[in-house]
A protein has these predicted regions:
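Short, glycine- and charge-enriched coil/turn segments that flank and shape catalytic ligand pockets
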Residues: 16-19, 64, 86-89, 157-164, ...
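Generic structural signal for well-ordered, non-membrane alpha-helical segments
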Residues: 21, 25-32, 93, 147, ...
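Active-site loop ensemble at the mouth of alpha/beta enzyme cores that anchors a bound cofactor
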Residues: 21-24, 55-133
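Solvent-exposed alpha-helices and their adjacent loops that cap or buttress functional pockets
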Residues: 41-43, 62, 93, 102-103, ...
Length: 208
């Protein structure tokens, strides 16, 4: 039984500015509403018409009449993409904790997390453009430069001189959505850095 239709205006991620993202959102909504109308005209009782995505909806895009749900799904956590789209005014709430494993040169630092823990996603254009493959939240202007399966490399002398082998660092993923799906558990941390609760990732491995 078909109850509804939904769309995701993913091209808003590459919009050159906020106004363009808003226009893309309206176009996507109009297209989705048109498809819902076609379904109804062909005998389907469509009660749900849903839209995304976070870059446009979080920047106050208009919601057209007939839209019944919105899905800015990155909103609870945010990430480096959205941090840029929001002009660095929103807090990122999800981090990957990594360990400094090696400092083999005067500016190179190697961490114990790689593509299997952060993904290789990046974006070079648009409001969600980022530099590097993950931001180090506690070290301004520091990002991951290279990444392999199980380790990441940072070329930054200031960061190099600020950490020692064994230190823990918090990484803001470039795109949090696939990162959450890479882990079995996540931890809620209070303002002091203490673990308040361990959560199981309910949708882990549910893609098949």
């Amino acid at each position: 039984h078909l109850r509804g239709v939904f769309s995701h205006d993913g091209d808003s991620y590459s919009a050159k500015d906020i106004e363009t993202a808003r226009r893309k959102s309206v176009i996507a909504q109009e297209r989705t509403l048109k498809f819902a109308k076609m379904c109804r005209e062909n005998g389907f009782d469509i009660s749900i018409v849903g839209i995304g995505s976070t870059p446009s909806l979080a920047n106050d895009s208009d919601i057209l009449e007939g839209i019944t749900e919105i899905r800015p799904r990155t909103y609870p956590f945010m990430d480096a993409f959205q941090d840029n789209a929001m002009n660095h005014t929103w807090n990122c709430n999800a981090f990957v904790l990594a360990t400094v494993m090696s400092k083999p040169t005067e500016e190179r630092v190697i961490l114990d997390v790689g593509a299997k823990g952060l993904t290789m996603q990046s974006r070079s254009e648009g409001i969600c453009a980022v530099e590097g493959l993950g931001n180090l939240i506690d070290y301004p202007d520091t990002h991951i430069d290279l990444m392999y399966d199980e380790h990441a490399i940072i070329y930054n002398k200031k960061f190099h001189d600020s950490v020692k082998v064994g230190d823990k660092v918090r990484i803001v993923p470039v795109h949090i959505c696939p990162v959450v799906n890479l882990y079995d558990r996540m931890y809620l941390i209070d303002e002091k850095g203490d673990v308040e609760k361990e959560l199981t990732i309910a949708c882990r491995g549910k893609l098949q």
